[in-house]
C-alpha cells in the first residue's frame, strides 16, 4: 500500500507583478518523510512554504495537502502548522503566555488539558526552564524553538518550517533534530528549508532544489550526493612542490586556484579538481614517490557541490 501524500503539487506557478516567483513547480512529500527545500536567496523557497501554510495562493497549477485540494483562498489548511521567515511573538509576554494566546486564537482547550498541552510542547522544544521568561530577551535560537513549540500545539500532520536550525547552538540543533526525527517516525510529514547542508544530510530523505523559481532537482538525497562530478580536494603533503609536479602530470587532475567557498589560504595545501579515479591515481603516485600524504579532504561536501553546480547552471544558463 502506498504511503499517503502530505503534499502533492503539480505545475504550481506564482507571480508577483511581472516577477515569476514559482515556475511550474512539482513537489511530492509523503507522510512520515522529512523533505528538504533548498536554493539560493530569491529561488522561491519562502513563497512555496507560504503556499503550503495558506499564507498565499498559487496563480496556476494544482495543490493537494493531506489529500485535500487547496482552494484559491487565503486559509491555513487543516492539519498544517509551521512558520516562515521567523515566528511571530509578543515580546512583552512570556513563552508560556505566547503559547496560551496562540492556543486561544486557535480555539484550543483553555482548561487543564490546554495548559498541559502547552507544558508538553515547551518541554518538547527544550524551553521548560525559560517558559516564564519574557520573549523580548530570547536569542534567535530560542525564538526558533518557541516557533516550533507553537507549531506543535495542534498536533499537525504536516509541519512546515523555514530555517528551523537558524541561530541554534550545537546542543540546540541536536535537540531539534531529535524532535523532527521522532515526529516523522510517528507519521508527520515535514517540509523544511535550510541553507545548511549538514541539516539536510542529518534529517532529510529527499530534497527539492529550486533556482530562479524552477525545480532543478527533486529526489533522494543519496542520489544527489552520489552523482559523478568533479570536486575540489585539499591535499597537504610533506613535499608540496613534488605533489604539485605530480598533479600537473596526472591525467584528469586540474590544479585549482585556491580561492572560492570553503578554501582557506594555506601555502602547504594544494587544491586539485578531479573525479575520484583520477584522484586515486594521483595519491598512489605521491605515495610511490616517497611523499607523505597528511590531509586529503573535499573542500565542500558532495551534496554542497551538487547544489552549487545545479543552481549555478540554472542561474547562468551554462
Q: Language-model features: where?
A:
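Small/polar loops that bind or transfer phosphate-bearing groups
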Residues: 81, 85, 192, 235, ...
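ABC transporter nucleotide-binding domains
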Residues: 4-7, 14-211
Amino acid at each position: 500500500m502506498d504511503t499517503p501524500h502530505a503534499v502533492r503539487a503539480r505545475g504550481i506557478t506564482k507571480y508577483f507583478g511581472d516577477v515569476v516567483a514559482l515556475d511550474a513547480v512539482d513537489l511530492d512529500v509523503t507522510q512520515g518523510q522529512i523533505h528538504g527545500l533548498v536554493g539560493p536567496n530569491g529561488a522561491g523557497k519562502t513563497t512555496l512554504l507560504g503556499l503550503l501554510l495558506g499564507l498565499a495562493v498559487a496563480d496556476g497549477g494544482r495543490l493537494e495537502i493531506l489529500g485535500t485540494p487547496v482552494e484559491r483562498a487565503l486559509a491555513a489548511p487543516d492539519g498544517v502548522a509551521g512558520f516562515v521567515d521567523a515566528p511571530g511573538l509578543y515580546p512583552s509576554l512570556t513563552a508560556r503566555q505566547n503559547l496560551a494566546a496562540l492556543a486561544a486564537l486557535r480555539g484550543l482547550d483553555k482548561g487543564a488539558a490546554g495548559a498541559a498541552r502547552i507544558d508538553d510542547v515547551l518541554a518538547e522544544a527544550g524551553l521548560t526552564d525559560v517558559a516564564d521568561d519574557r520573549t523580548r530577551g530570547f536569542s534567535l535560537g530560542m525564538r526558533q524553538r518557541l516557533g516550533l513549540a507553537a507549531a506543535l500545539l495542534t498536533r499537525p500532520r504536516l509541519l512546515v518550517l523555514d530555517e528551523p536550525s537558524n541561530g541554534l547552538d550545537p546542543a540546540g540543533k541536536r535537540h531539534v533534530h531529535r524532535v523532527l526525527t521522532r515526529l516523522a517516525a510517528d507519521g508527520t510529514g515535514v517540509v523544511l528549508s535550510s541553507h545548511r547542508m549538514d541539516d539536510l544530510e542529518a534529517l532529510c530523505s529527499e530534497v527539492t532544489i529550486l533556482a530562479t523559481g524552477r525545480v532543478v532537482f527533486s529526489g533522494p538525497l543519496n542520489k544527489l550526493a552520489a552523482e559523478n562530478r568533479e570536486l575540489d580536494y585539499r591535499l597537504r603533503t610533506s613535499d608540496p612542490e613534488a605533489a604539485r609536479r605530480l598533479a600537473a602530470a596526472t591525467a584528469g587532475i586540474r590544479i585549482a586556484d585556491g580561492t572560492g567557498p570553503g578554501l582557506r589560504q594555506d601555502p602547504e595545501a594544494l587544491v586539485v579538481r578531479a573525479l575520484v579515479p583520477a584522484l586515486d591515481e594521483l595519491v598512489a603516485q605521491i605515495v610511490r614517490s616517497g611523499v607523505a600524504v597528511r590531509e586529503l579532504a573535499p573542500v565542500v561536501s558532495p551534496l554542497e557541490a551538487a547544489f552549487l553546480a545545479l543552481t549555478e547552471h540554472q542561474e547562468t544558463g551554462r
